[in-house]
């Protein structure tokens, strides 16, 4: 039952940056012993609010009230001292230090200028035990997994007696087992009476953990859902984007041209049996399968990231020899990879450079001088047409949201003569509004005659976007479904591993 007095309240919070109004009149309450989710599209204001709560930013208007007391934090240390801790997606730890040193960084127990390592390790051990973690406090942090790093970050918050702990996209780099462990810890923290704020784009996580959900849109408060029995996926999407869920995918029947891409008994590392399929001009074919099905491995082989070990790839009925990505690009086949940060973008380069990097070679002056005029025009054109939200073309792409990074990668390939596009998990870790924009780009490419082959583990997405669904299971094609006939039961039935007849 909800308490009558909130432990944390936001009262009329506004935040303005030069030329940008990031937050306007944000007001809502959070209660002790609850997980309160914050949802909204990228740019909705969630991260800005957390930075105000943590002392990174001062609000332009309004106030933060904690346990009935109006607070004003000059910096993050002041917020920590008031019991506020933020667990960011990019963890703020020191790899070369020990686990214990990271937990008590800034408050190491010492006497006469010498750190009391025995006491340090003992106290750190208590915090780790509290979280159910069997880790030697004297272990250098660099030897731990990302999931263990996160537990150290939480232990660091508990060591400062944090009563308010906010998690910002905490599962983005975790394995399934690490996610389960994180959820166990969050539920324990809730039982202890702490306020938990949880930011995620993943609906299944929100429904698994939350006692309340507050939705933001364009820097404004939309609604707080407090009865979790009465809220569903569709209601959340509508609150976030102002559209019904049926409008998100926007699929419509279309006509197709001649066969554009054909795989004839193709094998690649991670693909167990030869794969044969075809995609016509203007057709969108979705590859669906569970983890380990071989979708990404097939995509990498087709683009030359790994070597095709058998079979033949054809584009417009012509055999293509693909031994490296440049061969695929020259043939008109492009890839948006699954891990866009590691394999798609060049993080420390500008949006302009990331869009132009592939087609640049075709527009150099005199064979060696970069054509700045063409590059500026090309980047600006794709920023406008793809609605890439950036202060300008010279902004570092690492500072953009995942959805805008993905659109920049699409802009890169739109600068080429594209016949086939391979999309591997194109909307992973992207908010629902940006997903809608990505789908529209996919439809536009199909309308231009591009053959689209996209792999996704998001079954509703595959069913909602693809004209035809090819289901993979353990490195082989298990079946094929047409858009008008496909449903989740059929697709999952095909995707599930076969039970061995040898098992009793």
UniProtKB/Swiss-Prot annotation:
Pfam families: ABC_tran. This is Arabinose import ATP-binding protein AraG. SUPFAM superfamilies: P-loop containing nucleoside triphosphate hydrolases. It catalyses: L-arabinose(out) + ATP + H2O = L-arabinose(in) + ADP + phosphate + H(+). Signal peptide: none annotated. ATP binds at residues 40-47. Keywords: ATP-binding, Cell inner membrane, Cell membrane, Membrane, Nucleotide-binding, Repeat, Sugar transport, Translocase, Transport. Belongs to the ABC transporter superfamily. Arabinose importer (TC 3.A.1.2.2) family. Residues 8-243, 256-499 form the ABC transporter domain. Its EC number is 7.5.2.12. One of its GO terms (cellular component) is plasma membrane.
